[in-house]
A protein has these predicted regions:
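Boundary detector for helix-to-coil junctions that initiate low-complexity/charged tails
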Residues: 1-99
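N-terminal subdomain of nucleotide-sugar transferases
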Residues: 61-64, 68-148, 313-315, 465-521, ...
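Conserved catalytic-core segment of nucleotide-activated headgroup transferases in glycan assembly
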Residues: 120-139, 263-358, 692-739
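Conserved active-site histidine-acidic residue motif and adjacent donor-binding/catalytic loop
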Residues: 151, 327-330, 340-359, 367-370, ...
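Nucleotide-sugar-dependent
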Residues: 199, 301-304, 349-355, 362-385, ...
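A short, active-site helix/loop in glycosyltransferases that binds the activated sugar's phosphate group
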Residues: 221, 228-256, 263-268, 329-331, ...
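A charged, aromatic-enriched C-terminal amphipathic alpha-helix characteristic of glycosyltransferases
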Residues: 276, 429-459, 820, 824, ...
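Conserved acidic donor-binding segment of nucleotide-sugar-dependent glycosyltransferases
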Residues: 402-415, 423-428, 809-810, 814-822, ...
Length: 870
């Protein structure tokens, strides 16, 4: 059985080799290669097991081999990756948070163009991709080129783009998904091509296509429909010639721009070197050479336009040689002229120009058919830069530039071909004059700067944007929809207010989880309440890295297109100091807010290997070695983090405690500036009325470090029918429970409730009277404590750092020793019950809260800090 399959594969190899070397294959090879990528790769990877079951190993091998044959291993790998994404191409839009932003892409990503292109055709890549990149950069745009077969990289590039140009791509599922992603992000799209490959009816009438086998011909015509769908899916189109533009208009595309091929700096340099080295005056012999750069055998039919005339010129002028560069089947009119025909195989571009420069006359015959009206005049341009006169067919691209008899000849029929070639053969002066005129014409008209300014700039002008407001880029480990932690809540709120009320444009860089649709370190752009967010998927195993080098490149790209004036780093966990390295590389000043002990301690909250707060103020790195397997990590980490923190133009702390702790450890040349975190102001003035019951609340999560065990044990000993305990379990909103039923069932009057957010925070605090906050670690701020006091909720807290700075003992809360056990917490609870029982029903509970800062206060303070560095 295996031997039969191997023999079948050998047969397939031989058959494919025969096809590949046939004239018909070479005629439409660029289209066929794309079709193979489309049709054979669809099932290659994602559905491989099913294919083998249904079709057998033999057909599976044939599929894989045809893809490999069309483009080699690189194409096979790209195709596999591309099609493994097929099941996920729509899943981004299925995520609620990945929404349609309110701003236009070019107002976010400044002057950034992505070209998603078919790159397998060397000449097309040179003239339509590489040249365009050079011209865009000349105009002040950043330009990135991506293969259309790389779905994920293409999608990532779209997030960074003002404009996306799809060059010569078909309408695969992945390409259409990329176009949809552009629409989601308000990115303008252009579909570009330099051949009339999108009109089935015109291709069907082409003599070249008619020569193909019925199977291949069917594939080519199907390909035309695929290209047409891609053309119509984009906003606008770009054509290489006026004839091609007219065909695009005829398909229903309203806005079509013409962008001609031009002479890039590399080509001009190459031409100049060839001219200098050969000094055309030094001829290789006394022959006069007519040259035809036929390239592939697709030009057999085109050559018929001039074939008999050229043969006649050769017969009447024995000193004339006909040089062919590439593949060409000569008709019978050339019989007996072998001595006057010289052939050169397909070669590199530099060798092609050298062979061209050795000749005297260039020809560009093209069949008089609408398909060729789309062709560019590149043969005329290439001949002109090496100072050859040309005779060309009367198609639009040539008529547009050639002044007949001055800088070239136009030949409409065999008589004109013979007459005009004869004039050039017989008169050296005519050849020289015409060559100089042609050279002058193309250097003036087709130089990169000229084409960039006259043809490309009108295409991209509307998407060129300059900053009108100062731009701040903000780094934080989490962001909506993953609004985890107090620092994240603070960051979200102040960003929104800075942008809305202080005239800044704020851009956020945060982490996202990696999954099937979100690949590691390939950012996705979305929007939260008017603020642009770049979510960088970071693998779980990298979230603990303090120096995540993989983050540098994606962050650098974001900075490159956003062009911020200042960066503000909040919590860098997950992102790491690599984000700051990107700022340094781009010469962007940055401010750091130290929201916790991450800058001081390998363990973010200074929790030692026993799960307890380590108790250090002045950090002793020798003690830190007990918390890590690698003894070198603490000192290395400390040195690196100090370097980046000292490079900050200012370091902020949310509380005096946090500022003093970092100052004690000399983390920055200047004392840290206290920038007290704000909280959300209550929607209305909340004056509580005592209703006879006392409800205690705990929101710290089911973890001993936050004191959950103290709360449960203390309250189990509280015997008062008027006292209730309400525990917030944030996991409920995620479909889980963090408190088993048996843990709380033995506690009287205890209920578990889902977590709250900034939209229903008032409702939660209105439902409790006292907040329990018996933290066993030092808190840098204590957002929940301040939210409670602002809403007239009494607080019982341990002496845990920044938390206590808003507590007025006995007036809005109680501070118990940091080392308190459950008994001390129980005593504090009973004391508060006694205090509240002294109130009468309906008495007001209005606690002092003057030390509380709101988000508006913090934004005012940050505005002043930012302005000092702008």
């Amino acid at each position: 059985m295996l031997e039969e399959q191997v023999n079948a594969l050998d047969s397939t190899v031989n058959r494919l080799s025969a096809i590949e070397n046939s004239t018909t294959w070479r005629a439409v090879q660029p289209i066929i290669s794309v079709l193979i990528k489309l049709k054979r790769a669809k099932s290659l990877v994602l559905y491989l097991p099913r294919i083998i079951r249904q079709k057998g190993l033999r057909n599976t091998l044939k599929y894989a081999f045809q893809v490999f044959k069309s483009g080699g291993l690189r194409t096979l790998v790209h195709t596999a990756l591309n099609n493994s994404a097929r099941g996920h191409v729509h899943s981004l839009t299925e995520r609620d948070f990945i929404n349609k932003p309110s701003v236009l892409a070019h107002e976010v990503c400044l002057n950034s163009v992505t070209i998603i292109a078919e790159l397998s055709i060397q000449q097309c890549t040179k003239y339509r991709v590489t040249q365009k990149k050079e011209m865009l950069e000349l105009l002040g745009f950043k330009c990135e080129v991506v293969s259309w077969t790389d779905y994920y990289q293409s999608r990532t590039s779209i997030s960074h783009s003002s404009v996306v140009i799809f060059y010569r791509v078909p309408s695969t599922d992945t390409v259409l998904a990329l176009i949809e992603e552009c629409k989601r992000l308000n990115v303008k799209t252009f579909w570009e091509v330099d051949d009339l490959i999108f009109n089935e009816a015109i291709l069907a009438e082409s003599k070249t296509v008619s020569d193909l086998s019925s199977e291949v011909r069917t594939q080519v015509l199907e390909g035309a429909n695929s290209y047409k769908q891609a053309l119509l899916a984009c906003d606008m189109a770009i054509a290489s010639t006026s004839g091609l533009a007219e065909s695009m208009n005829a398909e229903g595309v309203e806005n079509v721009f013409i962008l001609e091929n031009c002479l890039d700096s590399e080509t001009l340099q190459l031409a100049n070197e060839i001219l200098k080295s050969s000094e055309k005056k030094q001829k290789i012999d006394n022959k006069i050479r007519i040259v035809y750069g036929s390239g592939t055998s697709t030009h057999n039919i085109d050559f018929e336009e001039a074939a008999s005339s050229i043969a006649k010129v050769l017969r009447e002028n024995s000193q004339v040689i006909f040089r062919i560069i590439g593949l060409l089947e000569l008709p019978s009119s050339f019989d007996g002229l072998d001595a006057q025909v010289e052939r050169f195989e397909l070669c590199s571009y530099s060798e092609y120009l050298r062979l061209l420069s050795e000749c005297d006359i260039s020809i560009a015959p093209l069949e008089k058919y609408i398909f060729n009206e789309a062709k560019s005049n590149i043969k005329y341009i290439e001949a002109s830069i090496v100072k050859l006169p040309s005779v060309s067919s009367p198609l639009s691209a040539f008529i547009d530039v050639i002044d007949d008899g001055v800088n070239g000849y136009i030949a409409s029929d065999q008589v004109e071909w013979f007459d005009k070639l004869t004039k050039l053969v017989c008169c050296e002066q005519t050849r020289q004059d015409m060559a100089i005129n042609a050279n002058t014409t193309v250097l003036a008209r087709y130089n990169t700067e000229s084409i960039a300014n006259t043809q490309l700039m009108p295409i991209v002008r509307d998407y060129s944007c300059i900053k009108t407001k100062p731009r701040i880029v903000v780094f934080n480990v989490f962001y909506s929809p993953r609004s985890f932690g107090g620092a994240t809540i603070v960051t979200e709120q102040i960003n929104k207010l800075l942008q809305k009320h202080k005239g800044y444009e704020v851009y956020v860089v945060t982490t996202l989880p990696v999954d099937d649709a979100l690949r590691a370190y390939e950012p996705v752009r979305y929007e939260v309440e008017g603020v642009t967010v770049f979510g960088v998927p970071v693998p779980n195993e990298d979230m603990e890295l303090y120096n995540n080098k993989s983050i540098v490149k994606p962050v650098a790209k974001i900075l490159e297109v956003v062009k911020p004036d200042l960066a503000h780093a909040h919590c860098l966990q997950g992102l790491g100091i690599g984000a700051l390295q990107s700022c340094i590389d781009k010469n962007i000043n940055y401010i750091v807010t130290v929201h916790d002990a991450w800058w001081l301690c390998y363990k973010q909250f200074m929790i030692d290997s026993k799960g307890e707060f380590c108790g250090q103020d002045k950090i002793d790195l020798s003690k830190c070695k007990n918390c890590t397997d690698n003894q070198k990590t603490p000192s290395l980490r400390d040195a690196e983090l100090r370097h980046y923190l000292k490079n900050a133009c200012e370091v902020l702390a949310p509380s005096s405690y946090t500022a003093e702790l970092h100052d004690l450890n000399n983390m920055h040349p200047k004392p840290l500036t206290v920038d007290r975190n704000g909280i959300l102001m209550p929607k209305a003035s909340i004056v509580k009325k005592f209703d006879g019951s006392i409800t205690f609340g705990y929101v710290g999560g089911n973890t001993p470090i936050k004191g959950s065990d103290l709360v449960l044990k203390a309250f189990s000993n509280v015997n008062n029918s008027k006292a209730f305990l309400k525990i917030v379990d944030n996991m409920i909103n995620l479909g889980h429970k963090s408190y088993p039923d048996h843990v709380v069932s033995s506690i009287n009057n205890c209920t578990i409730v889902p977590g709250y957010n900034q939209n229903n925070i008032d409702d939660f605090f209105e439902s409790i009277d006292v907040l329990l906050f018996p933290s066993r670690c030092k808190e840098s701020f204590g957002l929940t404590v301040r939210e409670a006091i602002a809403r007239n909720v009494w607080v019982i807290t341990t002496d845990s750092g920044g938390v206590t700075e808003c507590i007025i003992e006995g007036e809005n809360g109680n501070v118990i020793p940091f080392s308190s056990d459950s008994k001390k917490l129980e005593n504090a609870i009973n004391n508060v019950i006694t205090h509240y029982e002294k109130l009468k029903l309906g008495d007001d509970v209005d606690l002092p809260k003057d030390s509380i800062a709101y988000f508006s206060d913090q934004v005012d303070n940050l505005d002043g800090i930012y302005k000092s560095y702008l």
